[in-house]
Amino acid sequence: MNPRRKKRLGVVLAILFGLSATIGLIIYALNQNMDLFYTPTELVYGKEGKKPEIGQRLRIGGMVVEGSVKRDPNSLKVSFDLHDVGPSITVTYDGILPDLFREGQGIVAQGVLVEPTKIEAFEVLAKHDENYMPPEIAEAMKKTHAPLQYSQEQKQGSDQ
């Protein structure tokens, strides 16, 4: 190989190495910032056959269970249970809760799964009013909780 070809080969290899390193870093960054959305039922039973792993970042939406809010009197730590129509999960949060946060209201929490049914949240968002439901919660609840289907025998039995 003559010196000109060696130099050209070196430049091409350097460009390919830089390009592959850039693509690898972009994919790594996207994977680190991807937060999957779950309802409490999907978190407990799995979503499309897969359960989230401990340490995974995720978003979870549901209703705050009445009587489940526990506040630490010496700090801003708060713990509460979240449910949809299935099992409930525990969310812990260290910070100031939104003004609209209260028991029986819908919220979306973003955090890390620390136990199979416990999330350590770093952000809690409350819904706007009693009629509002974030589109992703409504869609997830529609998929997970199909309306009850009654057979003809069941329908006839209820008429008697």
From Swiss-Prot:
GO cellular component, one term: plasma membrane
Subcellular location: Cell inner membrane
Record topology, Cytoplasmic segments: 1-8
Periplasmic side: 30-160
Pfam families per the UniProt record, alphabetical: CcmE (PF03100)
Residues holding heme: 128, 132
Keywords, comma-separated and alphabetical: Cell inner membrane, Cell membrane, Cytochrome c-type biogenesis, Heme, Iron, Membrane, Metal-binding, Signal-anchor, Transmembrane, Transmembrane helix
GO molecular function: heme binding; metal ion binding
Domain of life where this protein originates: Bacteria
Transmembrane region(s): 9-29
One GO term (biological process): cytochrome complex assembly
Entry-linked SUPFAM superfamilies: Heme chaperone CcmE
Membrane topology: Single-pass type II membrane protein
Record NCBIfam families: PRK13165.1, PRK13254.1-1, PRK13254.1-3
Function: Heme chaperone required for the biogenesis of c-type cytochromes. Transiently binds heme delivered by CcmC and transfers the heme to apo-cytochromes in a process facilitated by CcmF and CcmH.
Family classification: Belongs to the CcmE/CycJ family.
Alphabetical list of PANTHER family matching this protein: CYTOCHROME C-TYPE BIOGENESIS PROTEIN CCME HOMOLOG, MITOCHONDRIAL
Stated name of the protein: Cytochrome c-type biogenesis protein CcmE
